[in-house]
């Protein structure tokens, strides 16, 4: 998972901050509760430690994004985190919205085990799009 701005890759100095952003992208703009985010990002810590780790990761993520002028692509509300979907492009979203297979290359956030569910869904949709194109040809 990588994020680019004006053709350059954003440098995340903290892996958990980057993973938090990856979770938000994976959820496509859906609001994610602090509890749910803590479960996803947890490395087996107790709930309080996991929640504290989310707060730290959020702070670092926000600081990184602000340094690139991108602080508004994520938002935090009372007990939830979300992505401002209108402010970013994602190749997988484009594939799904436009029914075009050229956007998807068969990989999806391979560094995160929690992304395997979405990968299965994307592979299924990719095959459906290819099959439809073959039938239309």
Question: What kind of feature is each model-predicted range?
Answer:
Residues 1-137:
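Intrinsically disordered, low-complexity protein-interaction/activation regions
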